[in-house]
Amino acid sequence: MTNMRKTHPLMKIVNNAFIDLPAPSNISSWWNFGSLLGICLILQILTGLFLAMHYTSDTMTAFSSVTHICRDVNYGWIIRYMHANGASMFFICLFLHVGRGLYYGSYTFLETWNIGVILLFTVMATAFVGYVLPWGQMSFWGATVITNLLSAIPYVGTNLVEWIWGGFSVDKATLTRFFAFHFILPFIIAALAMVHLLFLHETGSNNPTGIPSDADKIPFHPYYTIKDILGVLLLILFLMLLVLFSPDLLGDPDNYTPANPLNTPPHIKPEWYFLFAYAILRSIPNKLGGVLALVSSILVLILMPLLHTSKQRSMMFRPFSQCLFWILVADLLTLTWIGGQPVEYPFIIIGQLASILYFLIILVLMPIISSIENNLLKW
């Protein structure tokens, strides 16, 4: 008799995706982040669901309802901090996952890569609307500043902003719709993640060498299920260390002050995972130029397959490209630091130089260095 997992219509899908899936025998721990992102998403949906049971999306009671969750709801504090810090873990895994894709040339799987970029945008949108919900000072002013950027769009900008706000300022209507968006978007992310996996399983996984691995495949279970479980345990360890020892480490103290439209905080800044993009936005003195640079900083990922000039897929055997990649990582860390600093000398000029370097590396230097490496290898 044939095994039920191979014949049952539902179990067959799970079997082909997680059990009998042929996987390259040499994929490293950098390939763990896909499954970790899945775990993060499930964790965020579950904790978010329990928070939504007690949260009220009204400007008068939103801040109090979050306080009520932390003080009066059984284990509400741990659910709230797991959700807040879970978002940080989500973005750490996301950045490492994208970085892995860039380093090992995974962007040559066009459909998988493009769905991944759409996923990145969707997760960023979800995190942004979620940050507004506690209705603290940084929530309110973050929402005001970021939504106001759309007013830079010629002709329709102002109307668009007021349409998103549901009035002439960020108010009750804005909070209610942001809560609705924040509730629905994770399910859209889950659906997109399924499409992401579907396209990935059409081609099979890439591997560190960038060489086709059809000649040497092993079943996903038990080899990579065990490997993924180790990753999950480490993820949960780091998350719980953060939640139980310093839950507010990555948050902003201003968000413990209820939203006040009459009092602007001295330094408006987003959560740490948006600081690199925020620094690029601020480095351009023109409003529309800044918005275009902000969007381009993520959208540039879509161009990666077009900018790939090397005859090799992976950077594993390309030392010059490796150096450039790690300079790009250092540049992004610099931008993240600058995004959290006040707009004054010397931070302005450092931010501008780091922003120029970011686009220069991706759009100009990487393709040139790859071509030089081809010539050095007599290709």
UniProtKB/Swiss-Prot annotation:
Heme b b566 binds at residues 97, 196. It comes from Hydropotes inermis (Chinese water deer). The chain crosses the membrane at residues 33-53, 77-98, 113-133, 178-198, 226-246, 288-308, 320-340, 347-367. A ubiquinone binds at residue 201. GO terms for biological process: mitochondrial electron transport, ubiquinol to cytochrome c. GO terms for cellular component: mitochondrial inner membrane; respiratory chain complex III. Binds 2 heme b groups non-covalently. This is Cytochrome b. Heme b b562 binds at residues 83, 182. It is found in: Mitochondrion inner membrane. Keywords: Electron transport, Heme, Iron, Membrane, Metal-binding, Mitochondrion, Mitochondrion inner membrane, Respiratory chain, Transmembrane, Transmembrane helix, Transport, Ubiquinone. InterPro entries: Cyt_b/b6_C, Cyt_b/b6_C_sf, Cyt_b/b6_N, Cytb/b6-like_sf, Cytochrome_b, Cytochrome_b_C_euk/bac, Cytochrome_b_N_euk/bac, Di-haem_cyt_TM. Component of the ubiquinol-cytochrome c reductase complex (complex III or cytochrome b-c1 complex) that is part of the mitochondrial respiratory chain. The b-c1 complex mediates electron transfer from ubiquinol to cytochrome c. Contributes to the generation of a proton gradient across the mitochondrial membrane that is then used for ATP synthesis. GO terms for molecular function: metal ion binding; ubiquinol-cytochrome-c reductase activity. The cytochrome bc1 complex contains 11 subunits: 3 respiratory subunits (MT-CYB, CYC1 and UQCRFS1), 2 core proteins (UQCRC1 and UQCRC2) and 6 low-molecular weight proteins (UQCRH/QCR6, UQCRB/QCR7, UQCRQ/QCR8, UQCR10/QCR9, UQCR11/QCR10 and a cleavage product of UQCRFS1). This cytochrome bc1 complex then forms a dimer. Belongs to the cytochrome b family. Pfam families: Cytochrom_B_C, Cytochrome_B. Heme 1 (or BL or b562) is low-potential and absorbs at about 562 nm, and heme 2 (or BH or b566) is high-potential and absorbs at about 566 nm. CDD domains: cytochrome_b_C, Cytochrome_b_N. Its cofactor is heme b. PANTHER family: CYTOCHROME B. It is a multi-pass membrane protein.
